[in-house]
Amino acid sequence: IYDFAILLALYTGLRIGELCALQWGEIFNGRIYVSKTMQRIRMNSGKTEVVVTPPKTDKSNRCVPIPSFLLPIVERFKMQSGYVIRQDNGNFVEPRLMQIKFSQRIKAYGIRQTHFHTLRHTFATRCIESGMDAKTLSEILGHSDVKTTLNKYVHSSFELKQTSIDKLPFVYAI
């Protein structure tokens, strides 16, 4: 289930808390309806507790398309109800545990350690590289401002720079 969670995050750009709070009733017609997030908060007693709350902003309430190639995989994991990412006993997987499982997975694959949120950045960068416009990407990510998407999430690569520069028309005589 953790590999499925990683794949889902990598191809939808969901935040870790949104993914952990996601229930099967919020996935239908090839779409994910994001309306809540899961987080661990510190209580007055000093202990922490996992809570499910509305997302950060109104823009975070959104509909995220699932790539067509991923739909058969989603169907393979689909259950009638409950959390999409759940433990064997049916309980939810909280963000802290998801991060631990993610770290274990990437270490096993020989990938340098990074945070689960990197999947969201990777998703954003690959979307722009594939030609998605910034406004559409910003809406998929649930950002209130396109500038947030471009300045914090999209990372230009040399290959993208080269491809972009090669699109310039040849107009000068040599």
Where are these regions (language model features)?
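Short, surface-exposed helix/turn micro-motifs that flank interaction/cofactor sites
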Residues: 20-21, 138
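Basic, Lys/Arg- and aromatic-enriched nucleic-acid-binding interface segment
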Residues: 1-16, 20, 60
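Short, basic (Lys/Arg/His-rich) helix/loop patches that form interaction surfaces
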Residues: 2-3, 12, 64, 79-92, ...
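Catalytic-site neighborhood detector that most strongly recognizes the C-terminal catalytic loop/helix
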Residues: 38, 71, 141-166
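Phosphate-coordinating loops and pocket residues in cytosolic domains that bind phosphorylated ligands
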Residues: 21, 29, 151, 155, ...
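Extended hydrophobic-aromatic, low-complexity segments
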Residues: 3-5, 34, 42-45, 74-75, ...
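Conserved tyrosine-mediated DNA breakage-rejoining catalytic core shared by Y-recombinases
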Residues: 21-76
